[in-house]
């Protein structure tokens, strides 16, 4: 890690259809091997399915899913005198968003539907309704933090 400068944050351009910066970050995470057009077609296809099935604005479903998946607290390992403790710490906003995006995509990829469009739309709808693998991951993280609450005084 460099000691001179912290890397400057790049300006992310909002997506063309909905004008949302977070959605662009989501698409960039879905993207493989720089194929942004494929990632866009996957995300927009999933949004079309959400719109036709649930009859609601897909961007609202997306935001609700992100809010329901984003963790408020997580555990980090801290070594104290030969023992390693799992110390619960609060999660910064940027990391909350990044974790929520990562967990949603991982959960969608591990589903058993035929195409990624179907898997992603199903996972987003589930997460918006507080169900699904991504929400379970957040609950497991919170449960782990709650179980290790006794070590919270080791926070840094």
Swiss-Prot record:
Keywords linked to the UniProt accession: Ribonucleoprotein, Ribosomal protein, RNA-binding, rRNA-binding, tRNA-binding
GO MF annotation list: rRNA binding; structural constituent of ribosome; tRNA binding
Presence of keyword RNA-binding: yes
Xref: Gene3D superfamilies: Ribosomal protein S7 domain (1.10.455.10)
Gene Ontology CC terms, in alphabetical order: small ribosomal subunit
Domain of life per record: Bacteria
InterPro entries in the record: Ribosomal_uS7, Ribosomal_uS7_bac/org-type, Ribosomal_uS7_CS, Ribosomal_uS7_dom, Ribosomal_uS7_dom_sf
GO biological process: translation
Family, per entry: Belongs to the universal ribosomal protein uS7 family.
NCBIfam families with a match to the protein in the record: rpsG_bact (TIGR01029)
PANTHER family registered for this protein in UniProt: RIBOSOMAL PROTEIN S7 (PTHR11205)
Function: One of the primary rRNA binding proteins, it binds directly to 16S rRNA where it nucleates assembly of the head domain of the 30S subunit. Is located at the subunit interface close to the decoding center, probably blocks exit of the E-site tRNA.
Subunit and interaction comment: Part of the 30S ribosomal subunit. Contacts proteins S9 and S11.
Protein name: Small ribosomal subunit protein uS7
